Amino acid sequence: MTDEIKKENAPKKLSIQRRTKTTVSGTSTTGKSKEVQVEVRKKRTVTTDLERKAQEQAKLKAKEEAEKRAAEEKLAEKAKREAEKAKAEQIKVEKAKAEQAKASKKNVDVEKEKRRAEEAELRRKADEVARQKAEEKAQKAAEEAKRYADFDDSDNDNGKLDDYSDYHLTSSYALEAENEEERRNENRGRSKNKVVKAKKGGRDDENGNKNERQSDRRNQKDVKGKGKHAKKASALQQAFTKPAQVAKADVVIGETITVAELAAKMAVKATEIIKTMMKMGEMVTINQVIDQDTAQLVAEEMGHKVILRKENELEEMVMEDRDVNAEKVHRAPVVTIMGHVDHGKTSLLDYIRKAKVAAGEAGGITQHIGAYHVETNDGKMITFLDTPGHAAFTSMRARGAKATDIVVLVVAADDGVMPQTIEAIQHAKAANAPLVVAVNKIDKPEANPDRVEQELLQHEVISEKFGGDVQFVPVSAKKGLGIDDLLEAILLQSEVLELTAVKDGMASGVVIESYLDKGRGPVATILVQSGTLNRGDIVLCGFEYGRVRAMRDENGKDIQSAGPSIPVEVLGLSGVPAAGDEATVVRDEKKAREVALYRQGKFREVKLARQQKAKLENMFSNMAEGDVAELNVIVKADVQGSVEAIVQALHELSTAEVKVKVVGSGVGGITETDATLAAASNAIMVGFNVRADATARRVIENENIDLRYYSIIYELLNEIKAAMSGMLQPEFKQEIIGLAEVRDVFRHPKFGAIAGCMVTEGLVKRNNPIRVLRDNVVIFEGELESLRRFKDDVSEVRSGMECGIGVKNYNDVKVGDQIEVFEVVEVKRAI
């Protein structure tokens, strides 16, 4: 074994190198002798005897392999003949059995089954024998081919230099054997026997053999696979059909969307949408918010299918998740007291409640909505809402009318119908609320109830006396006359209306009033309209939400629940809701918070859209108007209703020249933040029934801010008007103070034409502007250059005196002209 290894490792080639050094003498270009050393190298490669013997042995083995292959073919042919012979014998047996089956009619079915089984068994055995023989032969051929191929590969590298003919001969034998084996494997459809080349030689040979084996496996798999994994013929051709039109996806549009967002959803440029809307007659910018209908028209115009999405799906789901099929019961009427200033609304309600609250109200005006419920003598209940009587509280009175069932219109018998009385009638009609007229102050000597009925006829308030359906009840809030009759009239009207509500279930109502209490936080007065509001319920109220921590009635008493038509003060909301917001009890606090946040975001979006629209629409008009003076005001009041009413009244004071800008408003006392805002915006601070804390007062003093306190709205509006009047641009009026008639004209080398005049009216002053009149037409307007009486320069000349007048830059004075002297007077303006 060791000798064989030594033989294998013995060198197969022998290289002989020979070096010869020689010195050559020569003459350089300069004539000097020069010696040059020359080295001659010779190399000769001699092939060893071992290599020649290996080549001869390979030839012999290749010849033997060919002979063996011929013998194997003979054996295969012999096996084939044997199989055919067996098949012929099988056919004979089948024929014999068939004849036997024909002869025997009784056992036909049994014989058929037996024959089929025997046929299958014979066929299986024949196939098994043939398959085994073929596999054995193929295995032997593969092993022989593998051995010679490996030997051939190793000899190819060694015999390239000396004998090319032997190389081609040896390689052809191995290649032919390999190809023959591949053909057999392909014919049998088998992929188990793979032709693998030996790992011999360097790394390049290993990589090459590995690639060849992978290629062989892929080729055999391609031939065999004909099922779903069969590899198709690669034509290296790909086809791409260009779509006939652009694929347009569905566009989901919410209630509002910006132009940029719509362009992104439609996968087009925003300029395309702007062009489309310009064709439709709309001018928009890329960041402008458009409504759902406009976005739908634009998208459909550009060929997209639109899917409209309701953004308030969660809100609707929360609102609809309520108790159903609850039984309705009769409820107490909600009555709103309306009327003119000082006609006795609060005094009337005060007498009904048997509590003195009207005396403390400033100026006799109810400053914010109060809600009370009382019981009549027969045990029935009535809820009263008291709205302010001043015209500035229009929004509050309208809000009270929306929450009410019956309106009691209080009219003083001695005063008659007044402007606020007419407004109250209009609000009642807008709310479709029936009227009951209470003619107050009938105890006064000058009272005339019939005149009140006559005046109300002009406003379509027809009493039952004249064939109408409005009840007129004469009362006296001071002496208590007719109060029971008024309550009976209210109950009678409520029976006609058949007022009902769900008593058991989740409550809903409306916010009558709200304010921020320093100790208790946000406080909201809620009128329950249906269901029962319990302590601990989760209430969603406009932009705010919260759990009811405490409930109090109008007397400040803690209560646990409140049914329909009961007003209560609720604590526990996240913020101060707006008066008039709908209050609803919901099941889930988390969903209530989500709805409240959604409403806040929606309000901001709508507000932004309005601002952008106003900017676009008023851009050119604002440029034409120029600068408009603005009076910045910060309003703080005790309740939300007063804040809204004051802000509305201030906006109505705005004129074309001076505008009132409310930079901040809120409920509660004046804080340091309010004072800082006023200093930054140069605003007037207005406190209505509130005061500034110590920190705010310190900022106000340091910044010299104008802070004013009020308890009556008349005084507030009058002082704001005065401040606005001071901001108006003053008017200038020209007053003629003197008139002089030209009697003669003199020439002066220094002053030019000098007019000798007689002062006919008023007074002529040197420094005042003048006009030159000719035939009562102004021909020049300028100023006097000199004024002399005789030789003396004077400052003024009175009527009836003569004087010399030199007009500056004007020498065309003629006899008969009139010189009119005037002065410009500033006239203060007022709103």
UniProtKB/Swiss-Prot annotation:
Basic residues composition-biased segments: 190-200
Protein name (record): Translation initiation factor IF-2
Keyword Cytoplasm on entry: yes
Entry GO terms, CC: cytosol
Region (G2): 364-368
Originating organism: Histophilus somni (strain 129Pt)
Compartments, as annotated in UniProt: Cytoplasm
Keyword Cytoplasm included in the entry's annotation: yes
Molecular function as annotated in GO: GTP binding; GTPase activity; guanosine tetraphosphate binding; translation initiation factor activity
Region (G1): 339-346
Family membership noted in the UniProt record: Belongs to the TRAFAC class translation factor GTPase superfamily. Classic translation factor GTPase family. IF-2 subfamily.
Keywords tagged on the record: Cytoplasm, GTP-binding, Initiation factor, Nucleotide-binding, Protein biosynthesis
Gene behind the chain: infB
Membrane-spanning residues: none
Function: One of the essential components for the initiation of protein synthesis. Protects formylmethionyl-tRNA from spontaneous hydrolysis and promotes its binding to the 30S ribosomal subunits. Also involved in the hydrolysis of GTP during the formation of the 70S ribosomal complex.
Residue positions binding GTP: 339-346, 386-390, 440-443
